[in-house]
Design a protein with these regions (language model features):
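Short, compositionally biased low-complexity segments
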Residues: 1-3, 18-34, 66-70, 97-104, ...
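Short, conserved non-catalytic motifs in the polymerase core
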Residues: 34-42, 67-93, 107-119, 191-200, ...
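Conserved polymerase palm-domain catalytic core
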Residues: 131, 136-223
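Amphipathic alpha-helical segments in well-ordered regions
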Residues: 95-99, 103, 169, 214
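Generic hydrophobic, aliphatic-rich segments that mediate packing or membrane embedding
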Residues: 51, 70, 78, 88, ...
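Active-site-proximal segment of RNA-dependent polymerases
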Residues: 10-14, 97-159
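N-terminal accessory alpha/beta regions
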Residues: 46-59, 72, 86
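Non-catalytic, polymerase-adjacent accessory regions of viral genome-replication enzymes
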Residues: 1-53
Length: 223
């Protein structure tokens, strides 16, 4: 049982090898979507079962370590340095996203958009209209918008602080109920009821470990 986790969790879920292997295949499909002609995808697909099984064993055995990232420069829309994870590690990133995005999204403000289903361009336009109406006193006063960017944001993230925020959010949400109307992928054999908590459909011990592996990896030092 997780420390400080909500006591609503009655039967904490433990990830099985069979389930993880299936979830890794789904993550592979997500990571390779639109990229099947890329050489690194083709190379991984040549021994797909072997590669996914090896990745599964590393994750279950808590021996997984990300490979060095590939560093390169892009010029459009502006010159910047990019650190690209190896394809096998992108699969792990998609796995983590699939396991956690619906959990984290419940802690985000309404104006968080990136990678959230239902919060596309139209939603953004409607939210902008709402804020303009609110700031202009229903179109009666002038209001202003400012476009900002944080220089070197991803290069200077305080990873220890981010890890603390992420793990605290996971622990807090582990005891929350899963919405019956939510499209939540469930582990094999788990039935969703009005009392089902996130801790009963996600292995939070595994997620907390994987969170640390992803968050604390600095691509600038691992390339």
């Amino acid at each position: 049982m997780l420390e400080n986790a909500n006591l609503l969790i009655s039967t904490p879920y433990k990830l099985t090898r069979e389930q993880l292997l299936y979830d890794l295949y789904v993550a592979f499909e997500d990571a390779s979507r639109g990229k099947h002609k890329m050489s690194y995808v083709k190379k991984f697909e040549e021994h797909l079962a072997e590669n996914l099984n090896a990745l599964c064993d590393e994750l279950l055995g808590r021996t997984y370590k990300a490979l060095p990232s590939k560093c390169f420069i892009v010029d459009y829309p502006k010159k910047r340095e990019v650190f690209a994870a190896m394809f096998r590690d992108r699969i792990v990133h998609h796995l983590y996203f699939n396991y956690t995005h619906q959990i984290y999204e419940r802690t985000f403000i309404a104006d968080t958009y990136s990678c959230i289903v239902g919060r596309g361009t139209l939603y953004g336009v409607e939210r902008l209209r709402h804020h303009i109406r609110q700031s202009s006193l229903n179109w009666q006063e002038d209001c202003y918008a400012m476009s900002l960017d944080i220089r070197g944001y991803f290069m200077h993230i305080d990873r220890a602080r981010l890890l603390k925020i992420a793990t605290e959010s996971l622990k807090k949400m582990s005891g929350h109920k899963v919405g019956l109307t939510d499209d939540v992928p469930l582990p094999s054999g788990v039935l969703l009821t009005e009392r089902t908590t996130w801790g009963e459909v996600r292995d939070f011990d595994f997620l907390l470990w994987l969170t640390e592996q992803i968050v604390m990896l600095d691509p600038m030092e691992n390339c």
